[in-house]
Amino acid sequence: MKLFTSTLTAKKSSTHKPLISLALSVLISTLLISETAQAADANDRLEQEVDKQAKQLMAQYQIPGMAFGIIVDGKSHFYNYGLADKQRNQPVSEDTIFELGSVSKTFAATLASYSELNGTLSLDDTADKYIPYLKNSAIGNTKLISLVTYSAGGYHYRCLKTLENNKELLQYYKSWHPDFPVNSKRLYSNASIGLFGYISALSMHSDYTKLIENTVLPSLKMTNTFVDVPANKMEDYAFGYNAAGEPIRVNPGMLDAEAYGIKSTSADMTRFMAANMGLVTVDSQMQQALDNNRKGYYRTKSFTQGLAWEMYPLPTTLQQLVEGNSTETILQPQPIQLNEPPTPVLNDVWVNKTGATNGFGAYIAYMPAKKTGMFILANKNYPNTERVKAAYTILDSVMNN
């Protein structure tokens, strides 16, 4: 009986093994097909929504060309539209160089964070430590952290436009007096973070442009990003277009490199976005510098202020993002509540920054916790709120389906 039972068991086992293997194979194949189909559907939805938003924006604001770099769950996608140069009929590509405008400020913050990690700078230092000429002045007594977070007491947004040389620049800072107490309000300003970037370079005993182009960008492997576009890359440098449709590029100005002077491509800026989310390998100290930029120093009614970045706790709403990127928020003083001490590095947030020159408009937004974000480049300046709406709609189309 034992042998018979054993024989029956063996036969039963040999009968079921192929059936189980077949069932598993069918199940795995079905899951793979389903996953592939879902990924294809998601890619289709993404492309359709980007197409829709790009066509609407280009038609409404007469934008000649746009480039989108998008990361969804760690995977990069690129979409290009229109012309980089209307006269030459040159199409936009991932290698087209656009002006970033104030998105450049995120590189100034990165250099400073890197300098702090090297021990050459502290955000609690005052400006006069690096520029002795500013001793016994309001700005000289101001901490660097207040400069980079626009909370020093009120620099007007475009005050640098009237200055023509370093002598006039230092005289302006020396004679400046705050409009309101330090750390009481936020007033966005090129003069504030521009000086901060300038001091960051002084702390490392070098020139700002050289440090960005020879230290920061190579560390991030951003090979087509520049302060000064070299001669052999001018063919890839798009023309911007003003309200009259005339081709223009950014003019030199005081502290332009620090505040608004960097040019880049959608491929490079998507890599920059990926590095900020820890999705690509970069030098460990540079990675820590990128992460440290997302500490929260104070709160406005709309967002938490990091180093150059504005951060919105998830889940956020389109209304919050539009409010935080509105003209009023940029140009008018906003009451703040200090975080003492600053928050740890924030990941479960919508991180963003707008940027523009007279002929270009840019927007970057990413969510480290979701490994998702996007960059929009255009060779015409158009409203910040429209960039925000487009980005939110595009990312929502793939994340909530």
Swiss-Prot record:
Catalytic activity from the UniProt record: a beta-lactam + H2O = a substituted beta-amino acid
Binding site for substrate: K353, T354, G355
Main location per the UniProt record: secreted
Keyword Transmembrane set for record: no
This protein's name: Beta-lactamase
GO annotations of cellular component type: extracellular region; outer membrane-bounded periplasmic space
Molecular function GO terms recorded: beta-lactamase activity
Family under the similarity heading: Belongs to the class-C beta-lactamase family.
Summary of the function given for this chain in its UniProt record: This protein is a serine beta-lactamase with a substrate specificity for cephalosporins.
Miscellaneous: The class C beta-lactamase family has a specific amino-acid numbering system known as SANC, for structural alignment-based numbering of class C beta-lactamases, or else the simpler name structural position. A multiple sequence alignment was used to derive a consensus sequence and then the consensus was numbered taking into account insertions and deletions. This allows use of identical numbers, e.g. for active site residues, despite differences in protein length.
Localization of this protein: Secreted
Active site residues per record: S102, Y188
SUPFAM superfamilies in the cross-refs: beta-lactamase/transpeptidase-like (SSF56601)
Gene behind the chain: ampC
Pfam families attached to this UniProt entry: Beta-lactamase (PF00144)
Enzyme Commission number, as recorded: 3.5.2.6
Signal peptide range: 1-39
EC category: hydrolase
GO terms of biological process kind: antibiotic catabolic process; response to antibiotic
Keywords annotated in UniProt: Antibiotic resistance, Hydrolase, Secreted, Signal
